[in-house]
Amino acid sequence: MDFLTYLPSWLLPAVVILTISCILMLWTKPSKGASGLNLPPGPPSLPLIGNLHQLIGKSFHETVYKLAEKYGPIMHIHMGSQPVVVISSSALATEAFKTHDHILANRQYSNNLRRLTFDYNDIAWAPYGDHSKHMRRVLVTEFLNSRMSKSFKKVLDMEVKSMLDNLPYGTETNLNKVFGNFVCDFTSKVVTGKSYRDVKIRGKTMKEMLDEMIILFSGSFSEIFPKYGWILEDLSGWTRRVDKHMANYNDLLELMIDEHLDHTSEDEKDMIDACRPLLNREEMKAIMSNVYNGAIDTSYLTLVWAMSEIVKNPRVMHKLQDEIRSNAGNKARLDETDTSKMTYLKYVVKETLRRHGPSPFLIPRDCVSHIQIGGYDILPGTKVLINAWGIAKDPKVWTENANEFHPDRFENHVLEQFHMVPFGGGRRACPGYNFATLNIEVVLANLLYSIDWKLPPGLTLEDFNMEEEGSLLVTKKTPLYLVPIKHNTQA
């Protein structure tokens, strides 16, 4: 719902007038009702606007979580005129992903969403079918394979070395910026072979374009008013904003492809080398966009939250550093071979993804036929929203300390498939989840192997801010500042 904060001030009164007019029209028509159906429980809704009055202006995922505490792990709400079912438990997510995944494999679509996804040529948003299966197959078999991973390991090692070498040791450092630059450079190099972080298109950098993409994906009027939302998007300037952004973003991706074709290398292969023979140009841009949007912010935020929790919990930091340093020998830098032996490191990454999953909700699913979940009826045209943030706090799975950062829980916890879903599940699960987690483990291991981390002068653990903000992505409200101190690995 963040998109509403970026709209002009005159638009809300216009929506109110339109709403009143529609309510009057609705009252003159007989209600069809839902006789004989057992819909999920939920809060009372108003005509036309549904439950928007309860959701706008607040932290969307926290508001939904509180409503789910009251109405249950499967809940029916209306976002505008759009019926939505929210699933907030592991057991019901399992039923959705396993029993009804084929019914819930599609998205809900709009004209602006079509623009943002290169005419639905991507993986994440394409209608489920032969095309989406082909795109996913190309990404997995040609890009995320063992042969390509050898090349990526070299890139990762070089980027980790560059990050460590350029840290201002002994000085208060903004790790949001450090991690953001690192992830942007690494992702760009595995996709194109070079960094485009500082390249500008009409004054906009790649990072600024990706930040804008997050805003544009955060919601739209078409999602809450499917029949006439496009009118409000045109009136508000939202459509023009999408078009302006996509002109810049398209030119950036075109530049990447053109420069790559001019400087191909037989020695070092990247994603364009691997996938281009099997994709047309629009498909290539769409899959590049998926990787950039899916990998950069997810990895960056996970690193920020992981380091925040590690520093906030000295016992965790000491235990983790002991494991890393006892397994590392005297190597200059660590790689995947080293981290494969570090059990507690894997617990820390899992707990970070559980406690601070980058996106509180999975991309909404569209129910295409009548099904039942948890004994409740879900009707065609309903948007099904998987509450990953709520599932990660499900007391039936995580007990009473679900809100605490406690990596040791995984020593005794048998993690079943849908106990946590930071990367989705079923047919639309993120294909790069294993690639992402392995890389995060390597980066964290190096940060804690060769560096001791201190709080900035004057800051105590009690004052350390762990507040969240955002809806499509949950970010740390204040940047993470720490002081890196070189650790003597030879001692």
From Swiss-Prot:
The keyword rRNA-binding does not apply. Coiled coil: none annotated. Keywords: Heme, Iron, Membrane, Metal-binding, Monooxygenase, Oxidoreductase, Signal-anchor, Transmembrane, Transmembrane helix. Expressed in leaf primordia. The chain crosses the membrane at residues 7-27. Belongs to the cytochrome P450 family. This is Eupatolide synthase. It comes from Helianthus annuus.
